[in-house]
Amino acid sequence: EGEKNLENFIKKINKIYICDGHHRIQGMLKSNKKISPMIIAFPHNQIKILDYNRVLKSNLSSEKIISIISKNFKIKKIKNNSKNLKKGVLEMYMSNQWYLLKLIKKNKKLDVTILHENIISKIKATKIDFISGINGSSSLKKLVNSKKFNIAFKLCPTNISSVMSIADKNKFMPPKSTWFHPKP
């Protein structure tokens, strides 16, 4: 009877979004291998998306990086990073200083896409790592201060409606765009 209840419950579900591991599943489907992925379902209103930040190593000087970024962003030095970023606003930590980066022209793209197209692709990063927002901004600062990296970018979390809208258009988000919580 439990199986029948579960089956009836699943039949009532309109849409299912694969939020974590969709790139792996896509690869498995293309390879024609039989797959049996573990699936855990959460209602969209019970999922929280955290920021998924970047730390980079670039051989460019801080001044050159600021010059490149200033072509598309208003740059303001800030004492501490903020807790609530808005779409189109990023934070950067470099040379013991936090900066607020506000996009000059409004853009409908995801912040992660804007970051990659307007900054990361231009500053010739030699190394990049992705840091979950679950660890807070202090982990970004610590990694830069350790000299393993010299720049950190803190992003506004992507909202769930954007994730669903992109999926509804049969499009994919860039890798490492979201950090879903809870994690299965």
Locate each region found by the language model.
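Surface-exposed, charge/polar-rich loops and edge strands
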Residues: 1-184
